[in-house]
């Protein structure tokens, strides 16, 4: 399992973000504003008014970490400053903080996936919803870094920018079909990691090779390395066949185009709800630069799905990200990054066994517990 320590000072990394304001006009240090926002989000605050309210209630506590010489910034100041903070600089500070905090072990899965912030859409101002592409450490459920794109279709250009920010030495980087690109595969290898990429119709040559090499009957009765799982949950039964192979003749020419390609894999899923007619099988194809066993393919694919279950779900249900209607300037992106920091802290505190929402409420009520979260 990856080692996670958030002890290296968040305030130190936030203080590196340059302040865009004229020095003689500054009443509240930028690092104080950012730290206040993180703490308020940890405790469940959702908008600028609630963040200001939190600050007034916890000012003595906040002064243990920052200056706050002028007290608490107003909600108008918070909104204005967070809309104008350089999002790229804040992004860099976040990534550097996580590099200082987070050590990965050989073979650890880092899942890269995107999420649209639905609340950032503003029809009246002609602003489309922004899309955040995040790198997620599957072992302990924390975000390692993220970049913004204007829309989901831009993930192809966003992923290379995200990879530049990360320490991936020895990791297995999993990306869905949007990121199944030759340049991205090469960049992952250049970072000292291996790739596991989902293949769909956007790579027709690969998809055709899989269909030719692995018809359904061959997958179910595969004579090579295979791993089968059978799960029952609330009346639903799902059986998954996982197979892996070295590069076969169908992929021989393609292997010269995909740097480092060593393993091809297939996951076929059969699902049935109660006594209903079984659903049509779902087939997913994968290419990897790692020497994967069928069991490792199953584990890595499952860990990639944690992005939906452990990250996106937590952001939407616990931190109510999609309900947030803030979209002025760069505020939506900056506040999304504050949520990621807050969620990392909440995930990192493991002594209290409650869920994210319960941890937030406990932190809001108990300053000692909030201090424990910040000291993880």
Give the label of every model feature segment:
Residues 200-303:
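An anionic, glycine-rich sequence signature occurring as long contiguous blocks
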Residues 15, 278-282, 292-295, 314-322:
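Short acidic (Asp/Glu) and glycine-rich catalytic loops that position anionic groups and cofactors
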Residues 1-112, 119-120, 134-146, 160, ...:
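Dynamic "connector" segments at or just before major functional cores
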Residues 31, 46, 154, 333-336:
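Conserved active-site and cofactor/substrate-binding residues in soluble primary-metabolism enzymes
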Residues 100-174, 180-193, 200:
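Polybasic low-complexity intrinsically disordered regions
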Residues 300-376:
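Basic, amphipathic alpha-helical segments enriched in Lys/Arg and hydrophobic/aromatic residues
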Residues 36, 51, 74, 111-115, ...:
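Short, conserved catalytic/metal-binding motifs centered on acidic residues
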Residues 23-33, 276-278, 326-334:
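Structural motif
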